């Protein structure tokens, strides 16, 4: 089991180190909250847990907007890569899977930050050990795993 966990963490590490995949917690929260909140609320939410400062209804709305935005991106990419058909499918399928997991990891980070998780990266920009677990659980929930869903609720 430990070997599988190590391999999975290497996959997450590799994807998270691609350009544009890591979400800067503070920058994301400031950008997401700016149209809806005052500057003091934004500052407090970005330094603390947004869920403690912002109404849950707004957090849920922002979460749905993030999900919809990245679902559209994944769908567009998937459609474009599938158009050529034929031999190109051998290249399109791995590219499609990679971009799907990239979008899913971006959504996972954004949702984690909206609902009050601390920064998943340390001061050097590297994922913390517990971040791998958080991202794995979020991915499991997104993929429909009942076990991950139970772990998430705890």
Task: Describe the function of each predicted region.
Residues 1-80, 105-154:
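Terminal, membrane-proximal amphipathic helices
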Residues 91-113:
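Hydrophobic alpha-helical membrane-embedded segments
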Residues 77-99:
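Conserved phosphate/anionic-ligand binding catalytic regions in large, soluble enzymes, centered on
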């Amino acid at each position: 089991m430990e070997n599988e966990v190590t391999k999975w963490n290497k996959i997450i590490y590799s994807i998270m180190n691609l350009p544009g995949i890591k979400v800067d917690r503070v920058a994301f929260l400031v950008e997401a909250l700016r149209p809806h909140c005052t500057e003091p609320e934004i500052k407090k939410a970005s330094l603390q847990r947004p869920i403690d400062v912002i109404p849950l209804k707004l957090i849920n709305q922002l979460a749905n907007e993030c999900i919809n935005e990245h679902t559209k991106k994944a769908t567009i990419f998937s459609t474009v890569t599938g158009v050529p058909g034929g031999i190109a499918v051998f290249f399109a399928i791995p590219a499609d899977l990679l971009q799907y997991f990239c979008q899913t990891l971006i959504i996972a980070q954004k949702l984690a930050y909206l609902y009050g998780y601390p920064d998943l990266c340390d001061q050097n920009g590297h994922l913390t050990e517990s971040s791998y677990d958080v991202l794995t659980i979020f991915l499991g929930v997104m993929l429909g795993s009942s076990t991950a869903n139970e772990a998430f609720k705890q």
